[in-house]
Amino acid sequence: EEPGHFAARHLLGVVYLERGEYLVMIAGCHDCHTPNFLVNGGKGVEADYLTGGKLGWRGPWGTTYPANLRLYFQKMSEDQWVGVAKEIQRRPPMPFFSLNAMSEGDVRAIYKYIRWLGPAGVAAPSFVPPDKEPPQPYVQFPVQ
């Protein structure tokens, strides 16, 4: 392989990583999926980025918890993620409709960035049905 080809491939990888990092930030992924990101004014510890958390989001649907994306992404290929991102539907407050609307290039960039971060943390707590009391802490959404 010619040196220029290697450099071009490396640069393309860096561009994808930077794009993925940017998209994760502006799409608000850290807000729920990075522990304490919201309460720390949009600041987090990179070692904890996208590792989910134990803060529940409770509403008429039950109580949901932000998934550990760094573990989740280890279970699928990039092409599988592209398919999931276009079709996924989740309980609130996950804005799955925003993910569904992203371009394939953006979805791939997010995948590359999260895979680059590597596996870390533990799985999120399981969903709690609406008729069960979840453990603290949780954010209570108003009942409509």
Where are these regions (language model features)?
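Local sequence-structure signature of Cys/Sec-based thiol-disulfide redox active-site neighborhoods
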Residues: 21-27
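Short, cysteine/histidine-rich loop/knuckle motifs that typically chelate Zn2+
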Residues: 31
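Homeobox/homeodomain signature
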Residues: 19, 59, 66, 84, ...
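A structural feature that tracks compact, well-ordered secondary-structure segments
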Residues: 70-74, 83-88, 96-99, 116
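Short Cys/His-rich Zn2+-coordinating modules
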Residues: 11-15
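Flexible coil segments in periplasmic/lumen-exposed cytochrome c-class electron-transfer proteins
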Residues: 1, 9, 26, 34-64, ...
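Extracytoplasmic/secreted envelope proteins and their assembly/folding machinery
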Residues: 17, 21, 66, 70, ...
